[in-house]
């Protein structure tokens, strides 16, 4: 049984909505068929509402460290700003759903309205501190493989190799 929808950030390719001449079905279409909460970071809730058209009451605002139990599955929300102010990842046991924060070979864009390079650096450093055997499931597959362990990603992803904020700013 479906009990909720998790949103990594407000961009239409992740929650549905319109951008330019394109429309992506997403949570608003889902809510036409079933009533359930849409979990979005508190800083992202207005953006989700704006692009999807769902009501403020339909959004359950969460913050970093909040947990959601679905049956015996514990989902932890991790605030990872940078791509957007309220970007978040979901951690389920030893799996990380990273949205547009972290890809196998890259990270989310930081040249878009609302993005922030320094926040992205801190978010990536935070994710890099998770155990190496964490399975990474990114929001897009721009790599030869759709998933990898965080340890493998740390060895190959240039953005995770940078440990100095000044070097990061030059990327």
Tell me what each language-model feature is.
Residues 2-73, 155-159:
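Active-site HxH/HxHxD metal-binding segment of metal-dependent hydrolases
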């Amino acid at each position: 049984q479906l009990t909720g929808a998790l949103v990594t950030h407000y961009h239409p390719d992740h929650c549905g909505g319109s951008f330019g001449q394109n429309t992506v079905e997403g949570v608003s279409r889902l809510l036409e068929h079933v009533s359930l909460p849409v979990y979005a970071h508190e800083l992202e809730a207005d953006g989700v509402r704006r692009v999807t058209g769902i009501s403020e009451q339909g959004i359950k605002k969460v913050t970093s460290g909040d947990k959601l139990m679905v049956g015996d599955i514990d989902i932890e929300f991790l605030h990872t700003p940078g791509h957007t102010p309220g970007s978040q990842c979901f951690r389920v046991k030893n799996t990380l759903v990273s949205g547009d924060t972290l890809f196998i070979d890259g990270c989310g864009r930081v040249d878009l309205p609302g993005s922030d390079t320094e926040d992205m650096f801190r978010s990536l450093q935070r994710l890099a501190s998770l155990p190496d055997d964490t399975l990474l499931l990114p929001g897009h597959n721009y790599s030869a493989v759709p998933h990898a362990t965080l340890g493998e990603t740390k060895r190959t992803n240039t953005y995770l190799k940078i440990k100095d904020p000044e070097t990061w700013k030059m990327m």
